[in-house]
Amino acid sequence: MMHPVASSNPAFCGPGKPSCLNEDAMRAADQFDIYSSQQSKYSHTVNHKPMVCQRQDPLNETHLQTTSGRSIEIKDELKKKKNLNRSGKRGRPSGTTKSAGYRTSTGRPLGTTKAAGFKTSPGRPLGTTKAAGYKVSPGRPPGSIKALSRLADLGYGCGTAAFPYPMMHGRAVHGVEETSSEVKPPNE
């Protein structure tokens, strides 16, 4: 919205002109024509000149490719050489991680030293855990001959129980009969 502006300029508001407002209205229309022509001048699509892409020397690019290719080949050869040393059952297989639970070739858990008190042999078949019931110190599974010989040393025969404390069978049986007779109504 345009507001009329009072001016002391005689060219703008002269004594021979009827009113400044009419002149302003005409000038405003002329100005809009100017704006529209200037707007079309600036609003046309700008055509950019196609930029020429500058390429580096092809010698440098091939040089970079050969050096990177060589470094990859060298890394692969080093990995193959490392895997040659891992033959047999020692260590963990190549391609596995330490978190997979493989023990080192010494038989102790990973991350421990010999000074930590781990024996070189785990004392139980490989692949079993301590929770499987194998004793680590004697190196034999439970139920072995030594355990049977200990029972023989205790002096129990085949007719007696291995449990040294007497069981109270009579009391438990009578208690069950009493509770069952109270719950069941007599048939008589």
Curated annotation (Swiss-Prot):
InterPro entries: DUF5568 (IPR040419). The keyword Phosphoprotein applies. Keywords: Isopeptide bond, Phosphoprotein, Ubl conjugation. Residues 1-20, 79-142 are annotated as: Disordered. The keyword Phosphoprotein applies. Residues 1-10, 94-107 have a biased composition (Polar residues). This is UPF0461 protein C5orf24. It comes from Homo sapiens (Human). The lineage of its organism: Eukaryota, Metazoa, Chordata, Craniata, Vertebrata. The gene is C5orf24.
